[in-house]
């Protein structure tokens, strides 16, 4: 039976699962009925529209005057060349927002994304096909790579580039797919709560977890206009569950710490899955982990201190037992799924 309350239930649990380099699953709960979809839908839209990516916005091909032209010695006409070019996902290696990259190829050659890698750009889908030129052909072209968000049609790009370039539709978003599911979750014998399960796939320009963080930042920034004028108290009291929201990061995977392969593999073999497990350990317990060397120990200590949970500190205080129970529960659920 639902109790009468004066504030909404505060969700405090989050699970971050890195399925692959470009796919992640993020779960948050418990939400009161109606709150989950209210948050999930705009977050999904923001993943597509606010995540920063890179795209070619203009191309200039030697000997070609317009997009409906053809080029001697190239299998594709210019229109198909442009279609293939837009499918190649560029990533600028520096902090610049725009770069002009020049390429020159002599035939015979099949050109793919891997051939476009250089000191300025990285191609995150190197197997993508671009064009084929015969033995008598030479292909020289320049591409303008731009940093941006969302989608911008070529008509608007036209005003941003030089007249001798062909303007391209720009698909900046690196998010290929973002879906969410709502599942029921039990809270104190009450089944009328929900969890949000996001599955995010990116193209490799940014990782899925980074993309999700960026969309959350975008939502906070957009909402801040109300806080400034209406004097909103973001720390207003709300109902919460066992592990406090301020410690929610401790329920994230140790993969989030971006440790070296040696350190991560050592933790993995010791079946340490969550950041909270490290926060509960002192230095001697860490030293006792099999095959954990001095460098790995120092790395873990440095990372834990950086996120606010120094090894051996008493930051958690009265939350330790609750955290142990929650981690045990999560591990049990993981084992059941396996």
From Swiss-Prot:
It is an enzyme of class 2 (transferase). Coiled coil: none annotated. One of its GO terms (biological process) is DNA-templated transcription. Residues 1-227 are annotated as: Alpha N-terminal domain (alpha-NTD). Keywords: DNA-directed RNA polymerase, Nucleotidyltransferase, Transcription, Transferase. GO terms for cellular component: cytoplasm; DNA-directed RNA polymerase complex. It catalyses: RNA(n) + a ribonucleoside 5'-triphosphate = RNA(n+1) + diphosphate. CDD domains: RNAP_alpha_NTD (cd06928). Its EC number is 2.7.7.6. InterPro entries: DNA-dir_RNA_pol_insert (IPR011262), DNA-dir_RNA_pol_RpoA/D/Rpb3 (IPR011263), DNA-dir_RpoA (IPR011773), RBP11-like (IPR036603), RNAP_asu_C (IPR011260), RNApol_insert_sf (IPR036643). Residues 246-338 are annotated as: Alpha C-terminal domain (alpha-CTD). Disulfide bonds: none annotated. It comes from the Bacteria. GO terms for molecular function: DNA binding; DNA-directed RNA polymerase activity; protein dimerization activity. It holds the Pfam family RNA_pol_A_bac. The N-terminal domain is essential for RNAP assembly and basal transcription, whereas the C-terminal domain is involved in interaction with transcriptional regulators and with upstream promoter elements. Belongs to the RNA polymerase alpha chain family. Homodimer. The RNAP catalytic core consists of 2 alpha, 1 beta, 1 beta' and 1 omega subunit. When a sigma factor is associated with the core the holoenzyme is formed, which can initiate transcription. DNA-dependent RNA polymerase catalyzes the transcription of DNA into RNA using the four ribonucleoside triphosphates as substrates. This is DNA-directed RNA polymerase subunit alpha.
